[in-house]
């Protein structure tokens, strides 16, 4: 019980997770800056090399290699080892593969490899250069997980693997994404930096201008590459290599021969085909994957009159034909994860190779000196051969012979051992010459090795020579094309939309849809799908290339391209705006709908209950970035109770404003200033404290009507309201009563020509064209009344009009609209 310690769970968890984080950072996910390998990759290469599973020998079952690696060096799941081995064999993931594999090792389509019991593997030839000289005490070794064997903590790496093959991985708090590069270019940059240790980044980039992906493609953005090489972080555009191919009959097809690095080809083809299926861009007939053993090929066949460049631009922008590659060059440097630039990577590699060459030279020198000592002894033996033979024959045994040689002729222990084990056939004249030549060679070698160890310039010359040998043997052309500037993809969205005729309908409650002419013509107008408590306020024929603007009572405007509206049957209710517009309020209603071809020209006038008025330009309503999810303001309301009464296009006529208490004011529309969307406007009419605006409309006829809440209706001449100025009180159009006073419910122009466009929202039902302008009134008890407005006689300005029925005064008006 004395070993029990009381510790807080917080401290224990923090300390243990810290250990775990350090382990996975250093021992799992991040590469070493010197050899560019993660621990599992290093163990795979070392174990296969140790077992003799190298390129000059036959292939060996992958399962055997995986078992040896797992049993001796990597005590984790066999799948993690096999997956790492497979990745090192995939030529679309690595610029230079380190493992050669027979059998199915996966594909660019994301297909899994065959099980390890079916595949065979061996080290590639270039992988041998990563392990070169490892037996010469060139790198530190550490005990394996069970202290039964030692493994290298880094490989000698005769070429800069970190840059050549790149790396990617995620650990606790760190991630790395280092792109692959061209072997020749990397070696050229290393050689230049050996000669110029303080070389500028600009100069190094003359030799190493950018990444070189195994899948090719086009890399755009020289400035971002420079930034990444300087700081370790940056982002470049990687674009597929494409060409337009002519077909018979004047048709074309887009051919893709190279795709961005680490893009799944099958998923890419599926996404391109989804564009075709969903008709997101018209003109694609078929998408085919024609890849075979000769190379990658994706064919996108187009219709005869299709705009191939526009379609290609769309696919580049909205599929993985073009992607962004994010540099995040993090590597383990002196047991610490660091974000490193190009100069740091190259200098760390040069420093590592310096240590390797010096340690190798020391090892070779010691070996040469040991051999020279033996050779010197053997040459001396041959000069006194008869005496030596006699001495050996007189000795009792091998040990006695060795002792006699050391005492009588002053041979060392090593020389004595070599003499007594010397085979008789070597005691010939030819062997003497051979030994003398070997002695000379050994002395020259020792001199050379001493120079390498003692003279830095000589050592660097060796380093450069060895790098150039690797380049000469394994150099291959650059696969990725570099372009200095990232091209901005411009898409003519109008050309992407198939122009079709359609009918657009909008209800006051916010339901909208588009309907094909076939469905619309197959039904009557009354059969429109809507809620019982809703009202259809807009139906109009339009083209899918046009735009819909919806203005609400709360001063918001909603934009929708016609082609984005849900295509439904005429009898369907439609899509409610709250499904997509996050700020569409429960009490908000659609006041006015307008279909426009462009936003270049046009003015609107908005009038609020508080009597404020403004004009604003349609240009300001051009689509905003978040139009799919949010509306934007077209007028600022004075308070929470304020509402927009009228919104309509502006014509160069007078405006007539009528208040609930019966005041009417007429003034020129030119008096209303054009203001920005967020302004509240200017005072249109001078309201009394208990009054508010009921209606506003443009004066386009000689008369107008006034309907009160009690159901009284009259028609009066526009001239009875003479033109004055904005912000006045106006004239009364009702006679004040002490009991049951009349209040204006609705007012509007009476059109003598019913085909003329009406600019009051409440009278704007363009879908119904009748011979007469009708006023429909629904009472609170559900009674419906229809009155032909032109049949009404003109009344005096101060009269209260006539009731539309004997009982309407008691029922009162619930809804009124013109059609």
From Swiss-Prot:
Functional note: Topoisomerase IV is essential for chromosome segregation. It relaxes supercoiled DNA. Performs the decatenation events required during the replication of a circular DNA molecule.
Listed GO MF terms: ATP binding; DNA binding; DNA negative supercoiling activity
EC numbers on record: 5.6.2.2
Catalytic residues (positions): 118
Recorded name of the encoding gene: parC
Keyword annotations of the record: Cell membrane, DNA-binding, Isomerase, Membrane, Topoisomerase
Organism of provenance: Streptococcus pyogenes serotype M18 (strain MGAS8232)
Topo IIA-type catalytic domain span: 30-496
Family per similarity comment: Belongs to the type II topoisomerase GyrA/ParC subunit family. ParC type 2 subfamily.
Site entry (Interaction with DNA), positions: 38, 74, 76, 87, 93
Record PROSITE patterns: TOPO_IIA (PS52040)
Catalyses which reaction(s): ATP-dependent breakage, passage and rejoining of double-stranded DNA
GO annotation (BP), single: DNA topological change
Cellular localisation: Cell membrane
Residues the UniProt record annotates as site (Transition state stabilizer): 117
GO annotation, cellular component aspect: chromosome; cytoplasm; DNA topoisomerase type II (double strand cut, ATP-hydrolyzing) complex; extrinsic component of plasma membrane
Coiled-coil residue spans: none
Keyword field contains Membrane: yes
Stored NCBIfam families: parC_Gpos, PRK05561.1
Membrane topology recorded in Swiss-Prot or TrEMBL: Peripheral membrane protein
CDD domains for this protein: TOP4c (cd00187)
Subunit structure comment from the entry: Heterotetramer composed of ParC and ParE.
TM ranges: none
The protein's name: DNA topoisomerase 4 subunit A
């Amino acid at each position: 019980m004395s070993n029990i310690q009381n510790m807080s769970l917080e401290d224990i968890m923090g300390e243990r997770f810290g250990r775990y984080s350090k382990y996975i950072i250093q021992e799992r996910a991040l590469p070493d800056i010197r050899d560019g390998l993660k621990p599992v990759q290093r163990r795979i290469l070392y174990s296969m090399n140790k077992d003799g599973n190298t390129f000059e020998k036959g292939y060996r079952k992958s399962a055997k290699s995986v078992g040896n690696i797992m049993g001796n060096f990597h005590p984790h799941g066999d799948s993690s080892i096999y997956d790492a081995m497979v990745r090192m064999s995939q030529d679309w993931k690595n610029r230079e593969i380190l493992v050669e594999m027979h059998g199915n090792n996966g594909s660019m389509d994301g297909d899994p490899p065959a099980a390890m019991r079916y595949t065979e593997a061996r080290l590639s030839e270039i992988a041998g250069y990563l392990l070169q000289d490892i037996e010469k005490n060139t790198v530190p070794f550490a005990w394996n997980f069970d202290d039964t064997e030692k493994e290298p903590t880094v490989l000698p790496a005769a070429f800069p693997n970190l840059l050549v093959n790149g790396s990617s991985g995620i650990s606790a708090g760190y991630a790395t994404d280092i792109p692959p590069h061209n072997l020749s270019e990397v070696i050229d940059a290393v050689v230049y930096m050996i000669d110029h240790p303080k070389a500028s980044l600009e100069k190094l980039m003359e030799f190493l201008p950018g990444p070189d992906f195994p899948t090719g493609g086009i890399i755009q953005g020289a400035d971002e590459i420079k930034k990444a090489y300087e700081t370790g972080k940056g982002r470049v555009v990687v674009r597929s290599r494409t060409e337009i191919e002519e077909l018979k009959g004047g048709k074309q097809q887009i051919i893709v021969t190279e795709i961005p690095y680490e893009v799944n080809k099958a998923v890419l083809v599926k996404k391109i085909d989804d564009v075709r299926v969903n008709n997101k861009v018209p003109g694609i007939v078929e998408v085919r994957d024609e890849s075979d053993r000769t190379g990658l090929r994706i064919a996108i066949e187009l219709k005869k009159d299709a705009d191939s460049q526009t379609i290609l631009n769309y696919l580049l922008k909205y599929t993985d034909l073009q992607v962004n590659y994010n540099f995040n060059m993090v590597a383990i440097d002196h047991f610490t994860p660091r974000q490193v630039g190009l100069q740091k990577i190259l200098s760390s590699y040069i420093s590592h190779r310096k240590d390797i060459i010096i340690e190798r030279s020391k090892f070779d020198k010691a070996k040469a000196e040991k051999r020279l000592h033996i050779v010197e002894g053997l040459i001396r033996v041959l000069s006194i051969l008869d005496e030596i033979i006699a001495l050996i024959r007189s000795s009792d045994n091998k040990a006695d012979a060795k002792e006699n040689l050391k005492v009588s002729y002053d041979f060392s222990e090593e020389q004595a051992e070599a003499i007594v084990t010397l085979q008789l056939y070597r005691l010939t004249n030819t062997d003497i010459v051979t030994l003398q030549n070997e002695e000379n060679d050994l002395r020259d070698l020792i001199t050379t090795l001493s120079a390498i160890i003692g003279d830095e310039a000589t050592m660097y010359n060796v380093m450069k020579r060895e790098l150039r040998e690797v380049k000469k043997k394994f150099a291959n052309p650059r696969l990725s094309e570099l372009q200095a500037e990232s091209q901005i993809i411009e898409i003519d969205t109008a050309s992407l939309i198939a122009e079709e005729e359609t009918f657009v309908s909008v209800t006051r409650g916010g339901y909208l849809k588009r309907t094909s002419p076939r469905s619309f013509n197959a039904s009557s107008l009354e059969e429109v799908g809507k809620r019982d408590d809703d009202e259809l306020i807009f139906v109009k024929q339009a083209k899918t290339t046009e735009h819909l603007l919806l203005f609400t009572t709360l001063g918001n405007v909603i934009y929708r391209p016609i082609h984005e509206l849900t295509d439904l049957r005429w009898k369907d209710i439609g899509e409610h705006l709250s499904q997509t517009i996050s700020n569409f309020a429960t009490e908000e209603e659609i006041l006015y709908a307008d279909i426009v071809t462009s936003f270049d020209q046009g003015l609107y006038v908005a009038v609020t209950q508080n009597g404020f008025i403004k004009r604003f330009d349609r240009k300001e309503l051009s689509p905003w970035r978040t139009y799919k999810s949010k509306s934007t303001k077209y007028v600022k309301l004075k308070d929470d109770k304020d509402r927009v009464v009228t919104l309509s296009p502006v014509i160069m006529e007078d405006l007539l404003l009528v208040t609930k208490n019966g005041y009417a004011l007429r003034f020129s529309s030119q008096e209303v200033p054009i203001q920005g969307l967020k302004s509240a406007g200017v005072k249109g009419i001078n309201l009394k404290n208990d009054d508010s605006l009921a209606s506003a409309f443009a004066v386009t006829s000689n008369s107008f009507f006034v309907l009160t809440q009690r159901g009284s209706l009259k028609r009066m001449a526009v001239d009875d309201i003479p033109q004055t100025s904005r912000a006045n009180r106006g004239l009364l159009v009702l006679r004040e009563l002490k009991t049951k006073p009349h209040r204006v419910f609705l007012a509007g122009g009476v059109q003598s020509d019913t085909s003329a466009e009406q600019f009051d929202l409440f009278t704007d039902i363009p879908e119904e064209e009748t011979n007469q302008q009708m006023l429909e009134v629904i009472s609170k008890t559900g009674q419906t009344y229809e009155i032909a407005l032109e049949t009404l006689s003109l009344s005096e300005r101060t009269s209260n009009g006539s009731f539309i029925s004997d009982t309407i005064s008691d029922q009162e008006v619930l809804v009124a609209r013109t059609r």
